[in-house]
């Protein structure tokens, strides 16, 4: 019996269908993103700028300012990566296409060609938004990976994006840049989430 039931005599209904939905918060948007490899030099420069900026603005209570990233010189949209190709590539690797996404913890939105979409495993979400028939942005969220099968699916999926589409992964939270055409780099990065 829940707290509301005890205090107010209310019956709360938990919708178990919503529990496994891919979920992201607004602050996570493109924080760990997959982008064209042509952006590598720009990203390496940005990482150095971020490191200098954090040294200047760090205090014992956090930071005194916010770093605003510039747009990438080679946006994912310019690669004309088709939605149908992208989704087929990922679902063939064993990920599931979501019909809905939980946004900011409570809002549930339907996936469509004009909204954010997700393809996921229980421990890994690959989000993307679209413009017409093409992928606009790709970003991920990863939780604790406890299955060897899931670990291998994620490695193979990210590697396929690196090999077939020459993509790289940038984690702006930790300033980690991963060449997705290098399985060793992918595995090393994912070990942060492995249990």
Placement of each model-derived feature along the sequence:
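Acidic (Asp/Glu-rich) sequence patches and key acidic residues
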Residues: 2-195
């Amino acid at each position: 019996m829940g707290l509301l039931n005890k205090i107010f005599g209310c019956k709360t209904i938990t919708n178990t269908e919503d529990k496994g939905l891919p979920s992201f918060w607004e602050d996570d948007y493109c924080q760990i993103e997959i982008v064209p490899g042509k952006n590598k030099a720009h990203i390496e420069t940005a990482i150095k700028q971020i490191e200098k900026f954090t040294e200047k603005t760090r205090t014992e209570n956090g930071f005194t300012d916010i770093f605003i990233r510039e747009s990438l010189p080679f946006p994912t949209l310019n690669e004309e990566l088709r939605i149908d190709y992208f989704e087929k590539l990922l679902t063939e690797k064993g990920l599931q296409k979501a019909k809905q996404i939980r946004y900011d913890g409570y809002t549930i939105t339907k996936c469509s060609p004009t909204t954010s979409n997700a393809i996921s495993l229980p421990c890994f979400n690959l989000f993307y938004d679209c413009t017409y028939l093409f992928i606009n942005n790709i970003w991920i969220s990863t939780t604790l990976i406890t299955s060897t099968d899931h670990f291998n699916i994620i490695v193979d999926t990210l590697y396929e994006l690196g090999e077939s589409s020459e993509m790289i992964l940038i984690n702006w939270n930790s300033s980690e840049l991963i060449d997705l055409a290098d399985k060793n780099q992918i595995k090393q990065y994912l070990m942060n989430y492995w249990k």
